[in-house]
Amino acid sequence: MCKETVTGCIDEYFEYKFGRLDYRSLKFEHIHLDIDNYQGNAVINYNEAKYPFTRIIEHKHFEFGKQPSTIITKEYPQEYTPSDEPYYPINDEKNLKCFNKYKLLAEKDSRVIFGGRLGQYAYFDMDDTIASAILLTKKKLSI
């Protein structure tokens, strides 16, 4: 039997049968700077309340660029609205109750595998995302 993998929002997949799940979104600000180096690293996270952004990405450091200028991206947390891109699930009692209804519905459909942050309504770091995908694939495909 052919299986479909869904990594999008599980509530959207089921046409919001039990209501909408809440998410957190992001806003990105891209800035070109006429300096050769801004922060010396590709990514620096800012978790102190005094900063309005959560991280700054300096793209040239992913490829060890030697350009005379640089581009940075500041990432800001943002309330989610249906017209925004959902990035992170909101892990609270109300949303977990709603998600569990969708999860039960998903378990009844053997043709679909739900994965990732939005499909499993869980926060994953990248290493956890890869590990979860491998584990889920082995389990669902019996390999």
Where are these regions (language model features)?
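Short, well-ordered coil/turn residues at beta-beta hairpins
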Residues: M1, T7-G8
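C-terminal segments that line or cap access tunnels to active or ligand-binding sites in enzymes
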Residues: C2, E12-I143
